Amino acid sequence: MTIVNLAAYHFVSIDATEQWRPLVTARCNELGLRGTILLAPEGINLFIAGPREATDAFIDYIRHDPLFEGKFATLQFKESLSDSQPFRRMLVRLKREIITMKKPAIKPELGRAPSVDARTLKAWLDRGHDDAGRPVVMLDTRNAFEVDVGTFDGALDYRIDKFSEFPEVIDANRADLEGRTVVSFCTGGIRCEKAAIHMKEIGIDNVYQLEGGILKYFEEVGGAHYHGDCFVFDYRTALNPQLQPTENVTCFACRAVVTPEAQQSPSYVPGKSCPACAQAASAA
């Protein structure tokens, strides 16, 4: 059976997250969906999967059910396909933020930073500059272990371990960004949206967010100017530029990404250990 994988987020003020949670959970279970939906006062962030009929019904529900008062009427979804269900269960969780930055003054619903679509970005990267002739720098806002799976050619990577570290590393490295057009990017768009707003607020000019993130870029233009795959937070581990699951796996013990090459190591025991585990043990 072909499984449809949906990802979406939307920044919008929500006051009724506690009331919505059991109702959304019940509807997802009724449809046979699995995945995670995060609800917070600042909006929604979701990754769910199921048969086409179920995902289509969910899209109609979240956009049109009177419960949501039209808050998600324009919610846009990114879609990929897999041969099996990548999630084990269905969770609807309440959070303070749908992506944790610890900058409560940043409210994307009050105004986004400018965005650049995939085709325009590819044209900029093909030329080596934007439409105004400024050099373009790609800024990866993801965690270091995600970047190691794949990223844009020449992207800035400050090796952060969690997104809440982003404001501090930008403050320390803003000279890297001056005089250039900065395009922040992430997996699906949510982190780079907050990142771009923060950079605009601290006075960095010519900042854009990649509309829809890496996955939308893959969907629109493939893997141009990108090397490797894109890490995803489910049992597929990574998707290639054709949005197909790769042979990368996640170590059950330490959660490291294990490449096909690393899977040949004697240290790799499925469900128990990987080369990263062995290296950490030897260094202890």
Curated annotation (Swiss-Prot):
GO terms for molecular function: oxidoreductase activity, acting on paired donors, with incorporation or reduction of molecular oxygen. Residues 132-226 form the Rhodanese domain. The keyword Translocase does not apply. Its EC number is 1.14.-.-. GO terms for biological process: tRNA modification. It catalyses: uridine(34) in tRNA + AH2 + O2 = 5-hydroxyuridine(34) in tRNA + A + H2O. It comes from the Bacteria. The active site is at 186 (cysteine persulfide intermediate). InterPro entries: Rhodanese-like_dom, Rhodanese-like_dom_sf, TrhO, TRHO_N. Keywords: Oxidoreductase, tRNA processing. The keyword Oxidoreductase applies. HAMAP family: TrhO (MF_00469). Belongs to the TrhO family. Catalyzes oxygen-dependent 5-hydroxyuridine (ho5U) modification at position 34 in tRNAs. This is tRNA uridine(34) hydroxylase. It comes from Burkholderia ambifaria (strain MC40-6).
